């Protein structure tokens, strides 16, 4: 199984799969948590997992991604936030209520500036609507974007957010960050205009530096979408 997973299916053929169907959770609720600092949001992610809480879903977006998604989906995101966590908890109703209280205490201690808890299935779906539309939403504010797929240890999320901001200034290109925060999988979207001389090349170098940073922080070059990035820098990192 390790070989199959590590090679992303390239070193074998699956001829039969046995599935176990899980019962649908009795209750599912989502928290929408805003932060004034991206590093605080990263800290909150690590603190939640360290407390032994495993959310059904935990996504992170930065300020640029928040603005784009809110313009696109009107999901009720806090526009003033520098970072946003969407945290879903499921299970028996009593258990979910208790977990909500624990998670809210953790995120407020980490520096959350706002916390909303879904009060209906419609509101829960609305919380997720913005995140699910983040990629097309970013496509509306930039002619082109380059999406990366690196993964880092969750504890390094605050460091990576600071590194991303520094690289954005260095290359003179905006980046909208969308993360699967629960497993440390990053999807930074580097915004550029291929019709502007040099911007594509800068975006590719920016992307290579992101991947390099992932490796330096103890992560890997790709988390879920296979490695199709073919710059010389990525090839060098892939070879180790």
Residue ranges and their predicted role:
Residues 229, 233-240:
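Single conserved hydrophobic/aromatic residue that forms the stacking wall/gate
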């Amino acid at each position: 199984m390790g070989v199959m997973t590590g090679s992303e299916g390239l070193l074998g053929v699956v001829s039969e799969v046995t599935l176990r169907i899980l019962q649908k959770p009795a209750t599912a609720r989502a928290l929408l948590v805003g932060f004034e600092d991206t590093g605080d949001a990263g800290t909150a992610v690590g603190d939640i997992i360290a407390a032994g809480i495993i959310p059904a879903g935990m996504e992170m977006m930065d300020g640029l991604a928040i603005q784009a998604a809110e313009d696109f989906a009107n999901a009720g995101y806090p526009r003033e936030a520098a970072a946003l966590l969407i945290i879903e908890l499921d299970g028996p109703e009593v258990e979910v209520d208790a977990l909500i209280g624990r998670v809210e205490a953790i995120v407020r201690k980490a520096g959350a500036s706002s916390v909303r808890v879904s009060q209906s299935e419609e509101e829960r779906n609305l919380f997720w609507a913005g995140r699910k539309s983040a990629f097309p939403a970013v496509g509306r504010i930039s002619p082109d974007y380059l999406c990366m797929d690196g993964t880092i240890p969750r504890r390094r999320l605050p460091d990576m957010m600071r590194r991303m901001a520094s690289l954005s200034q260095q290359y003179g290109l905006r980046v909208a960050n969308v993360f699967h925060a629960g497993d440390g999988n990053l999807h930074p979207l580097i915004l550029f205009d291929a019709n502007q001389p040099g911007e594509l090349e800068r975006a590719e170098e920016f992307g290579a530096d992101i991947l390099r940073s992932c490796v330096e922080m103890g992560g890997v070059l790709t988390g879920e979408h296979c490695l199709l990035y073919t710059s010389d820098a990525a090839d060098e990192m892939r070879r180790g």
